[in-house]
């Protein structure tokens, strides 16, 4: 028996809603990485202004801590795992590709030099735009647009200014949407 066009549309809408509800569970990741990158950027900015030779210490402490916390979150989610919709599977693959791409860019930062953070901002923009579009969450789309604007500016900015642009980018692309998702998750519960 074949579904009517309306039944097919209803099924797609239901899949999107299911993916949205599960996406709310990912709010800790956005809050974690948004706050981690924002704080590390601002710490490095302040230390650079004070001519501190250990200006990257925030990254050295915060990134490994965030990775450890993310692994704990993932393990907790895997214990509660259910089957994933097609949209969720595609988004998982997209985030995996984002992580690999980010890693490649960051390990080549010495070669990229002042182009590193503008490229990172573009990667943030692409990933949050795709997520926001797929799940119809406007906060991510707005955040991605802000990241793209910050990336364009960053290509012409000093390293210190790039740190501020990076902090602003993750504030709008990760932290604020993550907090909004958390709020929606609590309202849905």
Language-model-detected regions and their locations in the chain:
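Membrane-helix interface and helix-disruption motif detector
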Residues: 50-57, 108-116, 158-165
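Helix-loop junctions at the membrane-solvent interface of multi-pass transporters
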Residues: 40, 46-47, 76, 111, ...
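Terminal transmembrane helical module of multi-pass membrane proteins
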Residues: 130-189
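Hydrophobic core segments of alpha-helical transmembrane domains in multi-pass membrane proteins
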Residues: 56-63, 118-125, 165-173
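N-terminal juxtamembrane cytosolic/stromal segments of multi-pass membrane proteins
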Residues: 1-26
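C-terminal ends of transmembrane helices
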Residues: 18, 69-84, 126-133, 178-185
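Membrane-proximal helix-loop-helix units in multi-pass membrane proteins
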Residues: 85-144
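Selected alpha-helical membrane-embedding segments in polytopic membrane proteins
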Residues: 21-107
């Amino acid at each position: 028996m074949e579904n009517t066009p309306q039944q097919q549309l209803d099924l797609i809408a239901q899949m999107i809603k299911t993916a949205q509800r599960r996406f709310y569970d990912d709010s800790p990741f956005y809050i974690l990485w948004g706050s981690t990158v924002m704080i590390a950027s601002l710490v490095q900015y302040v230390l650079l202004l004070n001519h501190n030779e250990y200006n990257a210490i925030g990254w050295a402490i915060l990134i490994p801590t965030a990775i450890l916390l993310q692994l704990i979150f993932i393990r907790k989610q895997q214990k509660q795992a259910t089957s994933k919709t097609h949209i969720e599977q595609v988004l998982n693959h997209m985030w995996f590709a984002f992580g690999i791409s980010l890693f490649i860019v960051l390990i080549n930062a010495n070669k990229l030099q002042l182009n590193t953070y503008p490229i990172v901002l573009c990667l943030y923009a692409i990933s949050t735009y795709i997520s926001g579009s797929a799940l119809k969450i406007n906060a991510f789309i707005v955040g991605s647009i802000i990241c793209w604007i910050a990336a364009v500016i960053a290509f012409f900015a000093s390293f210190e200014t790039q740190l501020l642009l990076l902090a602003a980018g993750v504030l709008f692309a990760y932290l604020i949407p993550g907090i909004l998702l958390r709020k929606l998750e609590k309202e849905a519960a």
